[in-house]
């Protein structure tokens, strides 16, 4: 477990709490359309291909935004970069409520595009915050804590949306407006709380020393992302993010699958999502703690991260049989194991970046990697929407087969690209110990 002894202090966890809050808002905002998908399709007469176009719009913007939002955060700092991100996504989130039925498809495509640009800054900023405020041995656990908030947002969405929105779609605008209020509160707290550890007046010398105990000093110079592309370590991380499409499949298509397969509607989607995403939260926390605990027991960072990710990949495998399961609750539990394994995999994947790259490159590398993952998810959305319109539910069969089997294959390639996880210095040269 992380060091929180009174002599050291734990102010860093206040900063982490704000990252947790921001990511919860991020995923609540992101999840609203997925929860309302069956209702919105009926209300606006969308086909599966139309719904896929709305999802693709978000992901195109999200992937493109990751390139420059990561660079903005690296160049201008976490405090201002994170603020810009959440203000942008809040504005476009609330704009969903202004869309009129006659322009529903075009309106949602435009609003989701703006939302994707803003939300693309959250994870690069969050991981950079953890890299600034936590030593390497605690980063996986800290990342697990804030990554668990993705499930909190996904859990809150069906209950809040289900309580506000009727089955026929009345009051569908209100959840989008609610996110703006929550985001305004976060911006106020963030601007009045965050500073870098070295200059924070409320941080004790002992805690600052602990934060810097196994961390390199950060310089003001930033590494352009074009210099990062040739590094095989960048591509190793990018491969781990390809599985983000699986998580988004659960998030954006999960309610549709449960509705079409088991007649689950907007009023009773809450409990299945609660089970799935509570399991995901548990996976996030356990996965983050496990690799950190192994490192503290003397395991190398390389071995601890990869063994943890291997266990995750094995846990995820049974999700391949979900489409042929007759029981709703067994299907929900298997999806829950898939989500839990993914979250554990994801937080260990994120920590590969600060484990290997210097701090000044962290947000940019994550942005590049996430963009690659988003590109794959876009292709998957287009294919799934097309297949569902033409062949009913057979598209779900292949979606779950890929969702369950891809992690083992990807981990093999990650190991080939980065067998020893040798860290890089500020010049992107290997540090030989």
Predicted features and spans:
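C-terminal ends and interior cores of transmembrane alpha-helices
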Residues: 87-102, 310-326
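Residue-level signature of mid-helix packing/kink "hotspots" within the transmembrane helices
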Residues: 31, 59-67, 154-155, 249, ...
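Conserved MFS/SLC helix-loop-helix module at the cytosolic interface between two early adjacent transmembrane helices
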Residues: 64-105
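Cytoplasmic helix-loop-helix junction between adjacent transmembrane helices
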Residues: 111-151
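A late C-terminal transmembrane helix in Major Facilitator Superfamily
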Residues: 284, 354-390
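Glycine-rich segments within core transmembrane alpha-helices of 12-TM secondary carriers
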Residues: 140-162, 280-284, 370-380
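Extracytoplasmic gate region of multi-pass secondary transporters
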Residues: 33-34, 230-287, 342-346, 350, ...
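Helix-loop-helix hairpin linking two adjacent transmembrane segments in secondary transporters
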Residues: 146-198
């Amino acid at each position: 477990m992380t060091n929180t002894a009174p002599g050291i202090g734990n102010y860093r966890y206040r900063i982490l709490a704000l990252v947790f809050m921001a990511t919860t808002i991020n995923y609540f905002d992101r999840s609203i359309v997925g929860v309302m998908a069956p209702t919105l399709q009926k209300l606006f007469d969308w086909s599966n291909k139309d719904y896929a176009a709305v999802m693709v719009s978000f992901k195109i913007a999200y992937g493109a935004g990751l390139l420059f939002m990561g660079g903005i955060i690296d160049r201008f700092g976490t405090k201002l970069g994170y603020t810009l991100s959440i203000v942008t996504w809040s504005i476009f989130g609330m704009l969903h409520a202004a869309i009129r039925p006659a322009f529903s498809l075009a309106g949602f495509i435009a609003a989701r595009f703006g939302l994707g640009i803003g939300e693309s800054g959250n994870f690069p900023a969050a991981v950079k915050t953890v890299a600034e405020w936590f030593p390497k041995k605690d980063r996986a656990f800290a990342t697990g804590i804030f990554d668990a908030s993705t499930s909190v947002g996904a859990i809150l969405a069906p209950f809040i949306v289900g309580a506000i929105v009727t089955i026929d779609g009345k009051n569908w605008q209100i959840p989008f407006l609610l996110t703006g209020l929550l985001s305004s509160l976060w911006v106020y707290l963030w601007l009045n709380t965050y500073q870098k550890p070295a200059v924070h007046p409320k941080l004790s010398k002992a805690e600052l020393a602990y934060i810097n105990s196994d961390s390199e000093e950060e310089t003001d110079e930033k590494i352009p992302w074009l210099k990062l592309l040739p590094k095989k370590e960048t591509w190793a991380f990018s491969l781990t993010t390809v599985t983000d499409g699986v998580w988004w499949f659960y998030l954006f298509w999960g309610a549709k699958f449960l509705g079409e397969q088991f007649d689950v509607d907007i009023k009773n989607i809450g409990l299945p999502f609660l089970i799935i995403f509570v399991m995901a939260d548990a996976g996030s926390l356990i996965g983050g703690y496990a690799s950190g605990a192994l490192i503290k027991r003397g395991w190398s960072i390389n071995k601890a991260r990869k063994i943890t990710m291997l266990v995750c990949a094995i846990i995820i495998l049974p999700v391949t049989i979900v489409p042929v399961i007759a029981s709703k609750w067994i299907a929900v539990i298997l999806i829950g194991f898939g989500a839990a394994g993914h979250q554990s995999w994801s937080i260990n994947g994120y920590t590969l970046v600060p484990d290997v790259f210097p701090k000044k490159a962290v947000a940019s590398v994550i942005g590049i990697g996430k963009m690659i993952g988003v590109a794959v998810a876009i292709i998957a959305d287009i294919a799934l929407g097309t297949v569902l319109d033409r062949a009913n539910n057979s598209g779900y069969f292949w979606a779950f087969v890929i969702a369950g089997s891809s992690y083992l294959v990807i981990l093999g390639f990650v190991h080939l690209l980065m067998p020893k996880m040798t860290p890089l210095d500020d010049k992107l040269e290997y540090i030989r110990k």
